[in-house]
Amino acid sequence: IDSQAILITTSEKLQTEVMEEVERQLAELPRREIAAKSLENSKLILVKDLDEALELTNAYAPEHLIIETENYMEVAERVINAGSVFLGSLTPESAGDYASGTNHTLPTNGYAKAYSGVSLDSFIRKITFQEILPEGIKAIGPAIEEMAANEQLDAHKNAVTVRLKAIQNS
């Protein structure tokens, strides 16, 4: 079992209280052997301040992140790597799994650094549209020509060169 839970806190008191509560709840679970096995990989991490907590969180890129602080909205603004974030003391992970409408198919093993969870947006085909006006092609044209030349894609370079000449001759 590779599941784990990680508590990052600035409070030794909270760390102790959580450890005691986990033991109490574990004893009541019908599948306590499985849960206990998952807890073998779990950690209680004491940090000096919120900055360190966020640094660790963003480096770890959790699949699920529960933020239970007084200023959880401010903290949430600093989260850059997480699959799904649960805000405040009334928002358990199980709400996201079953009822709140967010996604349950999330990036694991730190992949939240690069990927989002699967959502309806994952199945929507997107089309991008571009229009470059004369001022725009004059501004970016030389850079495009240089990049295309460096990649030895002469036709790409010429596609811009022809347009720049057409603007000059009009």
Model-derived segments and spans:
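Short beta-strand-to-turn element immediately C-terminal to the catalytic PLP-Schiff-base lysine
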Residues: L7-T10, L46-V47, L87-G88, S100
